[in-house]
Regions:
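Extracytoplasmic/lumenal domain signature
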Residues: 1-175
Length: 175
């Protein structure tokens, strides 16, 4: 090994996000609400959302959610600034899996949250646009996929449930 991190909290398995959060020219490794420097040492640990659900590890992501030109970490029910401070949070929502996309044409993107078998669409400040909507067929749900599934020029939200894959329109309906 070139390096090995210390033990991270709340990690079962997961997929790290890689981004240069602090603009030092070196990428950081984002795992849930924890950020490692590129040498494996801990840069910061957030105090809230973790982007995980059930017995599944974190799948956080990096996006400029508030359009300030700086990367933000989206982790479950929380958006962190690049320095680890909380930018937006909705404690009434569970932790879960996220995706970020612009669904309504406004400058700020929206945040999809999949957790506990339900789907929410959130504004960039973590207020609820719609949801919760149960995933047909049951199951906890996995990481959402954003794509134009039906070729109408608008993004939809794809989510795997226990027994089927479901595509939600941007208003939360399923065709």
């Amino acid at each position: 090994f070139k390096w090995r991190s210390g033990i991270l909290e709340g990690i079962y398995w997961g997929a790290p996000a890689i981004a240069d959060l602090n603009k030092d020219g070196k990428p950081e490794i984002i795992i849930g609400r924890q950020v490692l420097r590129n040498d494996g040492t801990l840069l910061w640990t957030g105090t809230a959302g973790s982007a995980s659900g059930g017995n599944v590890g974190p799948l956080s992501l990096v996006s400029d959610v508030n359009l300030d030109g700086k990367p933000d970490v989206v982790a479950g029910n929380t958006v962190y600034k690049a320095d680890g401070t909380i930018q937006a949070q909705n404690v009434s929502l569970p932790n879960g899996y996220n995706a970020v996309a612009n669904f309504d044409g406004t400058p700020q993107a929206e945040i999809v949250l999949v957790a506990d078998g339900k789907v929410w669409l959130l504004n960039h400040d973590m207020t609820v646009k719609w949801g919760p909507v149960a995933i047909p067929g049951g199951g906890y749900g996995g990481a959402p996929t954003i794509a134009d599934f039906d070729g109408d020029g608008k993004p939809e939200i794809g989510v795997a449930g226990a027994s089927r894959y479901v595509v939600f329109e941007t208003d939360g309906t399923v065709k």
